[in-house]
Swiss-Prot record:
Originating species: Xylella fastidiosa (strain Temecula1 / ATCC 700964)
Subcellular location: Cell inner membrane
GO molecular function: phosphate transmembrane transporter activity
UniProt entry keywords in alphabetical sequence: Cell inner membrane, Cell membrane, Membrane, Phosphate transport, Transmembrane, Transmembrane helix, Transport
Family designation: Belongs to the binding-protein-dependent transport system permease family. CysTW subfamily.
Full protein name: Phosphate transport system permease protein PstA
Length: 287
């Protein structure tokens, strides 16, 4: 090997070592703060995890209680948002993938959906407040909170359904249509079965996303310190209670806020891991 080649080889090795070192430092830097956040969350939230947390409602200041009404309110609004947003999102994603795939309208719809996907959640909350809450006499309710969350669910489900259906091999469509079955039956019995894992993953990711939303609920659900299951009345939610209690001067409320944050983090982690595992187990071959 000539002197010039040796010099070039050493230079490339030096650059490669420097790049690897910088990459490792950057990864460790991000990992350090992630571990720090998780450790703080566990150390401050774990002491408040007990049976009362899940069975008692939010207490007055300086008294013991739990977050049962907040858990119930969050569950009701998230369930309503998923029930309303999922069928609409799947239908819209199906139209994009199967009926309007090459049309100019589908390009516009995808563009608008991408904008909605990245829109600040507080804007969606203000939109529902103006469109629905103000026109119902200014009544805050779990239903209006669910409507705000629907606008977060929709773009996720639409994007996931569109992409998963387009990943299904074209030979499956041709084989089904060659048997003489109508297109709607081909979509429901062939394409949906093939893309079911990916679509379900999108729904789970949407659930994980809306479970921690606070901003849109400030203008819609408003909150309620009592036990309530009426969807047309103000209702508590875990993110709203956490936001209120974390900024309070009372130690008991702060402990409940940390405990609620820990429970919410574990829930989102489990849902995200479940969605990832489901997608990896049922991955559609890209052919």
């Amino acid at each position: 090997m000539s002197t010039a080649s040796q010099h070039l080889y050493k230079r490339r090795r030096l650059i490669n070592a420097a790049a690897i070192t910088i990459s490792c430092i950057a990864a460790l830097f991000g990992l350090f703060f992630l571990i720090w956040i998780l450790w703080t969350l566990i150390s401050k939230g774990l002491p408040g995890i007990d049976l009362d947390l899940f069975t008692k409602i939010t207490p007055p200041p300086m008294q013991k209680g739990g977050l049962a009404n907040a858990f119930l309110g969050s569950a009701i609004m998230c369930l309503l948002a998923i029930v309303i947003g999922t069928p609409v999102g799947i239908a819209a994603g199906t139209w994009l993938a199967e009926y309007g795939n090459t049309s100019q309208t589908s390009t516009v719809v995808r563009f608008v959906n991408d904008i909605l996907l990245s829109a600040p959640s507080i804007v969606l909350g203000l939109f529902v407040y103006t469109l629905y809450v103000m026109h119902t006499g200014g009544h805050f309710s779990a239903f209006s909170g669910a409507l705000a969350l629907v606008f977060i669910v929709l773009p996720i489900v639409v994007r996931t359904t569109d992409e998963m259906l387009r990943l299904v091999p074209g030979q499956m469509r041709e084989a089904a249509l060659s048997l003489g079955i109508p297109q709607w039956k081909m979509i429901t019995q062939v394409l949906y079965r093939s893309a079911s894992a990916g679509i379900l993953t999108g729904i789970l990711l949407a659930l994980a996303r809306i479970s921690g939303e606070t901003a849109p609920l400030l203008f819609t659900a408003f909150g309620n310190q009592y036990w309530s299951s009426n969807i047309f009345q103000p209702i508590a939610s875990l993110p709203l209670v956490m936001n209120q209690f974390a900024s309070s001067p009372y130690k008991s409320w702060q402990l409940l806020a940390w405990s609620g944050a820990l429970v919410l983090t574990v829930f989102v982690l489990l849902v995200s891991l479940g969605a990832r595992a489901l997608l990896l187990r049922n991955k559609i071959p890209n052919t």
